[in-house]
Amino acid sequence: MIRGLFVGRFQPVHKGHIKALEFVFSQVDEVIIGIGSAQASHTLKNPFTTGERMEMLIRALEEAGFDKRYYLIPLPDINFNAIWVPYVESMVPRFHVVFTGNSLVAQLFKERGYKVVVQPMFKKDILSATEIRRRMIAGEPWEDLVPKSVVEYIKEIKGVERLRNLATNLESSEKELQAPIRVPEY
C-alpha cells in the first residue's frame, strides 16, 4: 500500500486544495493530510483553529465524494527547516511520497530521500487562501472559490466576522504605533 503526504495550512480550505487532493488521491492508496501551523489561529494569516480547519477538510472531502482513505494530522510549526522533515516523520504515520507545490518543502523532503511529486496548481492567482481572506475582509465575493460545505461552515462559525474584527483591530494597533508620542507636560 502506498501512502502519500500532503501538507497545507488550509486557511481556509478552497477549491484549489480539493483539486490538488483529487490528483493526490489518484496516485496513492492513502493520504496523510498535514495541517500546518497547527498552533496558530485568530490572526490575519491564520484566522481558523486547527479544529475548524479539520472540520472544513472533513466536510469538503465528503462533499467531493472522497472515501475515508485519509488521516488529518495537526503539524505545529517549529521554524527550523533543517529538522522539519524528521519532525514531520515523528508526527505522522509512515509515508512513501510527498505531494507539494512548495519548492522549499520539495527540497527538504528530497534531501531526506523521499520521492516528491509537484502536484498541479489550479488557478493559483485566485484559488489562494490569501486572496480568499482578502476578499472576505474587503466584502468581495469569495464563496465561489471554496466548496459549498466550507462556505456553510465559515458562516456557522462567523469566520468572516472574525477576519474583519482581526483586520479592524490590526488597523487600530497600527494607527496607535504610528501616532506621535506625546510627553506629558508638568
Swiss-Prot record:
The keyword Repeat does not apply. It catalyses: beta-nicotinamide D-ribonucleotide + ATP + H(+) = diphosphate + NAD(+). This is Nicotinamide-nucleotide adenylyltransferase. Belongs to the archaeal NMN adenylyltransferase family. It is found in: Cytoplasm. InterPro entries: Cyt_trans-like (IPR004821), NMN_Atrans_arc (IPR006418), Rossmann-like_a/b/a_fold (IPR014729). Its EC number is 2.7.7.1. Keywords: ATP-binding, Cytoplasm, NAD, Nucleotide-binding, Nucleotidyltransferase, Pyridine nucleotide biosynthesis, Transferase. Pfam families: CTP_transf_like. CDD domains: NMNAT_Archaea (cd02166). One of its GO terms (cellular component) is cytoplasm. It is an enzyme of class 2 (transferase). GO terms for molecular function: ATP binding; nicotinamide-nucleotide adenylyltransferase activity. Pathway: Cofactor biosynthesis; NAD(+) biosynthesis; NAD(+) from nicotinamide D-ribonucleotide: step 1/1. One of its GO terms (biological process) is NAD biosynthetic process.
